[in-house]
Structures are given as structure tokens and as C-alpha cells.
Amino acid sequence: MKKGVMSAISMLMGATAGAGVVGKVQGDKLKITKDMSAKHLKLFLMMNQWVKVKQEGKNLSTYFENKGYKRIAIYGMSYAGETLVDELKDTGIEVVYGIDQNADSIFADIDIVTMDDTLEEVDAVVVTAITFFGEIEEKLSGKLNCSIISLEDILYEV
């Protein structure tokens, strides 16, 4: 009888612990999914603003010229970074290099380095990874003596 009761109690404890673990894992997955969703929404809204800027006949090179930025670097060389490089081609703005944590796997028309590399001084760094702008700005400020600007801010200011 004692064995049966102990077995039943052990089974209930195991089921409870298992349910708790499954709930925790599912909760973690849900948080990751929500974070990714928010990140992609911000990216979509930024790119939508860029389309509006282009529809108004504006070019981002004007922003940099008005600020006196001739040589820039771009942090975040995914879609937005590549698009910015393309937009600034054949303008008076030189994109000196890109910065990306996945520098080894990115192929671009400019040099791509990581934050750990020695960063050449430029007039400004444009951060395309807008979700993490605060963290990136803090790290870059310790390595460079230049303006660090969010691409999102540029798009709403131009």
C-alpha cells in the first residue's frame, strides 16, 4: 500500500514538474517571438518612412551634406545597411566601412569590420539596427569620437 501511495505521489510530482518546465519553455519561446515581431515591425515602419522620403524626391545624401558629414560608417549591414550603401553611391558621401557582428559572412562593396576591430575615424556612424540603438551607441562612443546617429532619426528629419 505504501509503495502505491508513494508511486502515485511521485507520479504527480513528476507531472507537475514536467508541466512547469514545459510552461517555462513555451513562455520563453513566446517572448522571443514577440521580441522578433516588435523588431520586424520597427524595421518595416522605418523602411516605409524611407519609401515616403523617396516619394517626396529626397535623398539621404542631402542630410549628410547639410550636417557636414563627408565620410561615414554604417553599423548593421543587413537590408537597411545595404540599401543605405546603394543610396549613397555616386554622391559626395563616402561610406568608408560597415560594422557588423557577422562581418565574416557579409559580402559588400565596402569593407566590413566588427566592433572588436580597430575602427577608422569617420564624421559619423549611422546605426541601422534601430532596436538596439542605445546599446550600440554606448559601445561606439567608447571607440570613436564622432556623431552616432540612428537611421530612423535621419529618415524622419530629412
Please state what every model-predicted region is.
Residues 2-158:
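Hydrophobic, well-ordered beta-alpha structural blocks that scaffold small-molecule cofactor pockets
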